[in-house]
């Protein structure tokens, strides 16, 4: 099976308002714009018992094994929402920890891919467990 290719665009907050804080998360409202800058994600189904995630590119150094993409897959596996395992290669063109949403947008785009390909059914409430940014970019998720 060949890889599916996904572009994961950087986003920038044009305005940001913190509404409240619950636990370690902030409830925010924001005006954002997507940039032409993007990471490239390759994804394919594999015959393995674990997902494989690999980061390449000039901004891949220092990305920890516990990251937004691995958290996404861990939650999906814990909830038994996905039948198969996937190999994911992410070419990092977006610098890390720059406030451009690189990791969150990577997870959001992978989740959006799984939803659009009808490989997963997930509720918006469950997406919030992963990231607010994931909810922002996954419009096909179920409301309830």
Could you say what each language-model-derived stretch is?
Residues 98-127, 131:
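DPxDG-like acidic metal-binding loop motif
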Residues 1-98, 115-122:
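ATP-binding N-lobe of GHMP and related small-molecule kinases
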Residues 137-142:
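Conserved small/polar residues in nucleotide/adenosyl-binding loops
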């Amino acid at each position: 099976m060949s890889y599916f290719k996904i572009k994961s665009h950087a986003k920038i907050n044009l305005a940001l308002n913190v509404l409240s804080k619950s636990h370690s998360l902030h409830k925010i409202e924001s005006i954002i714009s997507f940039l032409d800058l993007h990471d490239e994600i390759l994804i394919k189904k594999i015959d393995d018992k674990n997902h494989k995630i690999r980061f390449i590119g000039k901004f891949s150094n220092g990305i920890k094994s516990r990251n937004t993409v691995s958290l996404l897959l861990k939650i999906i596996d814990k909830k038994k929402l996905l039948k198969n395992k996937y190999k994911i290669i992410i070419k990092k063109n977006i610098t890390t920890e720059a406030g451009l949403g690189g990791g969150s947008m990577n997870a959001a785009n992978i989740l959006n891919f799984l939803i659009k390909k009808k490989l997963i059914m997930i509720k918006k409430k469950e997406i919030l467990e992963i990231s607010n940014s994931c909810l922002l970019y996954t419009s096909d998720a179920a409301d309830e």
